[in-house]
Amino acid sequence: LFRSAVAYRDRRTEGMDRKVYEFIPEDDLYGRTGIQKQIFNTIYQLMAVKEQQPGQLEWAKSMLMIPDYFHFLLTGKKVQEYTNATTTQLVNPVTKDWDIELIDMLGYPRRIFHKIQNPGYELGRLTEDIQNRVGFDCKVVLPPTHDTASAVMAVPTQEEHALYISSGTWSLMGTELKEADCSKVSMQHNMTNEGGYDYRFRYLKNIMGLWMIQSVKKESAPDMGFGEICALASKETIRSFVDVNDARFLAPENMTAEVKSACEEAGEQIPQTIGELAAVIYHSLAKCYAKTAEEIEKLTGIDYSRIQIVGGGANAHYLNELTAEYAGKNVYAGPTEATAVGNFAAQMIAAGELKDLKAARACIAESFEINIFTSNQDTE
């Protein structure tokens, strides 16, 4: 380990997209990988290392994502789990393996990319050192190590085509496809094709999510609970909107000031209180969800009857109400701890306790409370 891990919201990768596009045009990169451009993707992280600390790539023997590094510490074995590996923007969606031609093109050393294994793969047992520390031994099974991939496993539906939002710091809104859509139209809509359990593709869009509320709370109302903030927002009449996908909200020095500035620049009412700030953010998120739902329906040709919300955002009742209102679809919210539940489900399938993903989702639907928020335009 050459140094401490870096934060993905830092500025190391600024301009690294242009460096990557010197080797491969942006359109071609999407056509090869199907992954949405995010400046913190591993493809740009590695380019930052190559440009800023080239010696580190020359010396490196392995590139492990954080979950894979934990698995290495537990077992002493190095592999890269499929769902997380796809988000590097270096995996071929057809072969489900590293795109070696692309890796060579970018000048990254092949040796650092280890074998990709699927969720459910039995990696091994705890190392002797770990056994001595914890007092027991056990098998280590790979879950979907990308948090959204685990969360999507926990979407409690039996519908073949479900529309979901994994709602937390980020809002990941999408559906599942059997084959990746790497078309130019898909790219223009900034959709991504991330790997999922059983080689399903999580066809989704990354939306800024509750990071905005978390930041405003920290700055303006650190002692107030999220439930209280939701309640205040529901009583406000302000109807200003901001583009929640604007990069200005990714890592601003002050989120409160940034939201106010965005409203002022758009000639809209400027929120003053924590309730007004929250109302602007919640309405803006819900409006974005509705627009994204329409985009996904057009891209897939499927009319989705409901929206399934999993993750911590399932507790944001006011946001769920607004989502149902703006999207014109019923919202089914829960479970809130979807990432942990999906992780556990993958391990239960591997252990033979559950037959498959369909059985796991049926079990989850029966085991957790699901709150329903009804749309006035309900067609179910």
Which role does the model predict for each range below?
Residues N92-T95, P119-L123:
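Short beta-strand to alpha-helix junction loop
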Residues I100, L106-G120, F344:
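A conserved helix-loop-beta module that forms one wall/lid of the active-site cleft
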Residues H114-E122, I229-S234:
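Short linear loop/turn motifs
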Residues G76-N84:
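Enzymes and membrane/adaptor proteins characterized by extended Gly/Ser/Thr/Asp/Glu-rich
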Residues E14, Y21-G34, Q38-I39, Y44-M65, ...:
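Active-site core segments that coordinate phosphate-bearing ligands/cofactors
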Residues D10:
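Carbohydrate-associated surface elements
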